[in-house]
């Protein structure tokens, strides 16, 4: 019976993974205006409304004040213990992930913007809204944890273990729990729509496919490649790519967070600022076209040299932190891999080529 129950769990997880993927690709199949734009407007508006309602309810709970203080007042001793550099590194790494910097999502949706509005103003608006959503999510979770005397965790255990326990104890918990996970669903679907559209448009432009063919091919590949993620905590739990306690999701996170995001960002920067690529003059003319906030031209050296240097430090430190505990030989080997990938990005972004304007 136990094995049958576990088998049913795997099947349900697989089913919901396929359903969510199909929903995302169905929206993208309808196109920008009829699909992504219409559905995202409704979904994001509902997401923000639900977030505000949940946050107000959470901060008004008995004992929530302690959680608010924990959330908003920095503990400099903890920062000192963790190391200022590590804290800054973690914050910068999170910015890559939360803003989808480095995987092309911003590039794709930026190409859809009307020329009458400057890209700089839109970028600032996106950053402000993203920060607001992140802060509001904290007001939903942290005060509720302290109200019920539960120390807030991090990662999946916070969402799928700690919070359900809180909702189970809460008056009207079924309602608030349903609203919270509806909010998470909207957030997840909006994210996969952005990622899927990026994949679809990439194939349309690179191979000349129409949208229908690109959607079908990408949908099949994404579903197949997502299967190991679904099975990583159960059937394939014995696969531990980084030693005891690691799983397939850790490998996926390493590939994306430690490689794709920083290296993708670096590639974009080098391409936009180097003469062999798009070039600074073309870049600044594009981002400052239209009305709204303008990107300061005086920041050329910072964008061309300062930010790439910061990204390289983040990238190499990520490898060091990941593999430092494996011994000197293993660390040296992985750092060589990191440098080879870094060199490949520099070559691709700066090699002399004719760029279509």
Give names to the regions the model predicted.
Residues 22-25, 52, 335-349:
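Hydrophobic core of alpha-helical transmembrane segments in multi-pass integral membrane proteins
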Residues 19-26, 89-100, 179-190, 256, ...:
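Hydrophobic alpha-helical transmembrane segments of multi-pass membrane proteins
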Residues 1-10:
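Single conserved hydrophobic/aromatic residue that forms the stacking wall/gate
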Residues 19-42, 108-116, 192, 201-208, ...:
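Membrane-water interface regions at transmembrane-helix termini and the short interhelical loops
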Residues 37, 41-189, 193, 207, ...:
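Membrane-embedded translocation segments of transport machinery
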Residues 3, 48-74, 143-147, 228-233, ...:
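Hydrophobic alpha-helical segments and their helix-loop junctions in multi-pass secondary transporters
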Residues 207-219, 255-315, 326-331, 356-357:
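C-terminal membrane-solvent junction of multi-pass transporters and transport-like membrane proteins
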Residues 35-42, 121, 152-162, 175-186, ...:
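Transmembrane helix-loop boundary segments of multi-pass membrane transporters
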């Amino acid at each position: 019976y136990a094995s049958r129950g576990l088998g049913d769990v795997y099947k349900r997880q697989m089913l919901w993974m396929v359903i969510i993927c199909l929903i995302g690709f169905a929206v993208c199949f309808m196109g920008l205006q009829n699909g992504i734009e219409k559905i995202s407007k409704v979904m994001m508006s509902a997401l923000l409304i639900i977030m505000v309602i949940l946050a107000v309810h959470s901060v008004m709970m008995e004992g929530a004040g302690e959680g608010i203080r924990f959330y908003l007042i920095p503990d400099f001793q903890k920062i000192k213990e963790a190391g200022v550099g590590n804290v800054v590194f973690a914050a910068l790494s999170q910015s890559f992930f939360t803003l989808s910097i480095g995987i092309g999502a911003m590039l794709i949706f930026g190409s859809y913007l009307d020329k009458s509005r400057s890209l700089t103003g839109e970028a600032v608006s996106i950053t402000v809204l993203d920060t607001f959503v992140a802060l509001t999510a904290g007001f939903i979770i942290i005060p509720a944890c302290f109200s019920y005397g539960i120390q807030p965790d991090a990662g999946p255990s916070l969402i799928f273990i700690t919070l359900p326990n809180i909702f189970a104890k809460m008056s009207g918990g079924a309602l608030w729990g349903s609203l919270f996970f509806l909010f998470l669903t909207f957030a997840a679907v909006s994210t996969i729509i952005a990622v899927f559209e990026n994949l679809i448009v990439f194939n349309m432009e690179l191979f000349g496919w129409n949208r229908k063919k690109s959607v079908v091919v990408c949908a099949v590949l994404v579903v197949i490649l997502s299967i190991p993620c679904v099975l990583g905590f159960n059937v394939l739990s014995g696969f531990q790519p980084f030693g005891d306690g690691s799983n397939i999701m850790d490998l996926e996170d390493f590939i994306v967070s430690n490689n794709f995001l920083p290296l993708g960002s670096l590639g974009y920067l080098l391409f936009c600022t180097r003469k062999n690529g798009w070039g600074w003059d073309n870049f600044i003319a594009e981002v400052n076209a239209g009305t709204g906030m303008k990107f300061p031209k005086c920041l050329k050296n910072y964008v061309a040299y300062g930010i790439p240097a910061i990204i390289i430090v983040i990238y190499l430190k990520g490898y060091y932190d990941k593999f430092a505990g494996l011994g000197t030989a293993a660390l040296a080997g992985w750092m060589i891999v990191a440098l080879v990938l870094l060199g490949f990005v520099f070559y691709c972004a700066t090699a002399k080529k004719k760029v279509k304007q």
